[in-house]
């Protein structure tokens, strides 16, 4: 294995890639959720185990089935997990054939002078010297929600970080960047492996500028709150005043002006989900 800590023990940036779609859309959510415990769900822990298995397969050059019955991060490697992870491993190896593969590529965005430390780890990064193309691949183990690849803030964040790391550490300067999502447990009409390609300038300048502007907005004392589909994974959803206002407005529209709204803290996760769904915030 690598000298990286286990996936479950890795540090996470307050303005990280996995939550980028939330804090870009709702800058105030960062300050509102400060100090709140990030309690991992069983689904998230299982996804972490799948990522650990994928890394083991790539580093040891083994099939996922070679680890059947082993326990990783508290989860047994089952045939279903091995089958799903193998889809990702095969996709990475296909893309890496004849090229240079970097597994679990760590990066930071300090070269961009962000307002707070911004860093992360890309699952797999592949350099194609002939085409001057950098490919960043991301395993998504979730089965319930389709993950988009086109203009994804999370994947673009990973790609930007990987590109900066390649420039600084290996003197690699791509002209094109390909971003690939591998989601083997979701039956997407476009398949388990989906990709999106852009020119390096768009990522290095245009996306980077937008990302930094959003990062600076999160540090403002009056950073705005903006409810949306990103609320579903926000730690502060139960105490968010804007989400509460949304609940009150919807309830009064359904009932009458004498409706007594609940306190934000009393809203269950199911109630919050229902509020967002009724507001037509969960599209696609």
What residue ranges belong to the model's regions?
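Metal-dependent nuclease catalytic cores that hydrolyze phosphodiester bonds in DNA/RNA
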Residues: 1-134, 176-178, 189-192, 279
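Glycine- and charge-rich intrinsically disordered segments
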Residues: 1-10, 241, 246-247, 254, ...
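Short amphipathic alpha-helical segments and their helix-coil junctions
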Residues: 5-10, 25-38, 136, 144, ...
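Cysteine-cluster motifs in flexible loop/terminal segments that predominantly coordinate metals
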Residues: 26-30, 212-254
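Short, polar/flexible loop-turn hinges at active-site or ligand-entry regions and domain interfaces
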Residues: 35-43, 62, 143-147, 166-170, ...
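Mg2+/Mn2+-dependent nuclease catalytic core
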Residues: 97-218
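Charged, terminal alpha-helix-loop-beta segments
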Residues: 100, 188, 192-197, 237-239, ...
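Contiguous, amphipathic alpha-helical segments that mediate oligomerization or scaffolding
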Residues: 253-284
């Amino acid at each position: 294995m690598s000298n990286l800590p286990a996936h479950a023990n890795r540090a996470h940036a307050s303005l990280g890639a996995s939550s980028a779609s939330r804090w870009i859309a709702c800058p105030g959510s960062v300050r509102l959720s400060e100090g709140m415990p990030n309690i991992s769900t069983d689904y998230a822990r299982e996804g972490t185990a799948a990522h650990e298995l994928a890394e083991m397969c790539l580093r040891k050059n083994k099939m996922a089935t070679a680890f059947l019955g082993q326990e990783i991060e508290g989860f047994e490697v089952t045939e279903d997990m091995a089958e799903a992870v193998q889809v990702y491993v095969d996709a990475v190896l296909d893309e890496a054939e004849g090229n240079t593969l970097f597994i679990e590529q760590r990066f930071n965005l300090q070269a961009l002078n962000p307002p707070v430390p911004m860093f992360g780890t890309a699952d797999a990064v592949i350099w194609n010297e002939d085409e001057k193309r950098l490919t960043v691949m991301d395993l998504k183990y979730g089965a319930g929600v389709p993950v988009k690849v086109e203009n994804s803030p999370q994947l673009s964040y990973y790609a930007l970080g990987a590109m900066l790391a390649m420039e600084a550490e290996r003197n690699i300067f791509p002209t094109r960047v390909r971003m690939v999502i591998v989601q083997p447990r979701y039956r997407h009409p476009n398949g388990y492996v989906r990709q999106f390609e852009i020119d390096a300038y768009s990522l290095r300048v245009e996306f980077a500028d937008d990302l930094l502007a959003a990062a600076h907005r999160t540090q403002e004392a009056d950073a705005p709150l903006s409810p949306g589909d990103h609320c579903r994974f926000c730690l502060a959803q139960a105490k968010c005043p804007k989400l509460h206002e949304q609940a009150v407005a919807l309830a009064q529209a359904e009932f009458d002006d004498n409706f007594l709204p609940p306190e934000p803290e009393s809203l269950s996760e199911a109630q919050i989900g229902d509020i967002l769904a009724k507001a037509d915030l969960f599209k696609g």
